[in-house]
């Protein structure tokens, strides 16, 4: 069965236009792969350095960098003609982040990786929101945004269930390698889409 059909069968009554369907499908996959790791981050970092303060510090680096860079990048992003390409670039960056996790060897590498993840989020999150918002309708925007948020929440929960089993059975390396491959695939998919679709 086609992945987009599965996603669309879960989405409630109101049908999304083609652009929104693509964005929901692609970004739901990204949310899913990110959520495969976040519940197990502390366990992963404790293997590198058995210090809970380092776990907290290293995780804090990602959202703080993402937040600061979102402020700095947003004015520049407004000038970018094809903002969906920023989304593709952010997926490529996240692919590099997950590959770095697969070969993680030190706390300094972890901090660098978290900074890089912040860069990817600062490029991708506003680009997704702007692109998605541009394709919503005034009268249906609550439903259209609600469908995206609902899918993201379900994907987050399912990812935690699946990844716990994957980590237990095959370890972090294969989880991160898969996450990296999917991220790069999503970036290529968005990059190669005809521009008029997004």
Where in this protein do the model-derived segments appear?
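Helix-loop boundary and gating motifs at the non-cytosolic
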Residues: 9-63
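Loop-to-transmembrane helix entry/capping segments in MFS-fold secondary transporters
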Residues: 52-53, 138-148
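Residue-level signature of mid-helix packing/kink "hotspots" within the transmembrane helices
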Residues: 63-71, 156-157
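Helix-to-loop junctions at the C-terminal end of transmembrane segments
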Residues: 69-82, 167
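Structural signature of the two symmetry-related core transmembrane helices
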Residues: 85-99, 180
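Helix-loop junctions at membrane interfaces in 12-TM secondary transporters
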Residues: 102-113
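Intracellular juxtamembrane helix-capping segments at the cytosolic ends
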Residues: 123-136
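A membrane-interface helix-boundary motif in multi-pass transporters
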Residues: 165-183
